[in-house]
Amino acid sequence: MATGPRYKVPMRRRREVRTDYHQRLRLLKSGKPRLVARVSNKHVRAQLVTPGPQGDETHAAATSADLDEYGWEAPTGNLPSAYLTGYLAGIRALAAGVEEAVLDIGLNTATPGNKVFAVQEGAIDAGLEIPHNDAVLADWDRNRGVHIAEYAEQLDEPLYSGDFDATNLPEHFDEVLGNLQEDE
């Protein structure tokens, strides 16, 4: 371990690989609420957050587990569920009076077409004003899950035996999106 007067121990949340303080400061200087998008292998979370003296204040939040209320039966860690989670977070943010935000992807890599940008696209389609570059957003077929359905069709039947038939994912996506739009 490095020692000496020039050695500086990183802040705890940076050591735990949880917070990029340089990025956080840039986002806070914008003065807009942050759309915090966090993804895991099983779920997607989206929150609209503003900084406060006692800590960050959450104005609206949605997780992919909330999609069950709207009829979502597919797994909750994929790209279509990320889009729908962003859409749901956008609806809830507009209901809470938040109309604009900036995307906070945390320590995720900014790969075009990934799940954090699907969350952003869902929130934009719900009506939030979020500055973005269209080059990072996935095409509509990918948001609907056409790529997952095509892959599921190629699999042998014994290898593919789940509770949900992924070959019907695009139609299921359209159905759940319609349910979300009805509840706006």
Swiss-Prot record:
Organism: Haloferax mediterranei (strain ATCC 33500 / DSM 1411 / JCM 8866 / NBRC 14739 / NCIMB 2177 / R-4) (Halobacterium mediterranei)
Family: Belongs to the universal ribosomal protein uL18 family.
InterPro entries for this protein: Rbsml_uL18_euk
Transmembrane segments: none
Keyword rRNA-binding listed: yes
Keywords, alphabetical: Ribonucleoprotein, Ribosomal protein, RNA-binding, rRNA-binding
One GO term of the biological process aspect: translation
Name this polypeptide is given: Large ribosomal subunit protein uL18
PANTHER family (UniProt xref): LARGE RIBOSOMAL SUBUNIT PROTEIN UL18, RIBOSOMAL PROTEIN L5-RELATED
CC terms in the record's Gene Ontology section: cytosolic large ribosomal subunit
Free-text function comment from the UniProt entry: This is one of the proteins that bind and probably mediate the attachment of the 5S RNA into the large ribosomal subunit, where it forms part of the central protuberance.
Quaternary state and interactors: Part of the 50S ribosomal subunit. Contacts the 5S and 23S rRNAs.
Keyword RNA-binding (UniProt): yes
GO molecular function, one term: 5S rRNA binding
Superkingdom of this protein's organism: Archaea
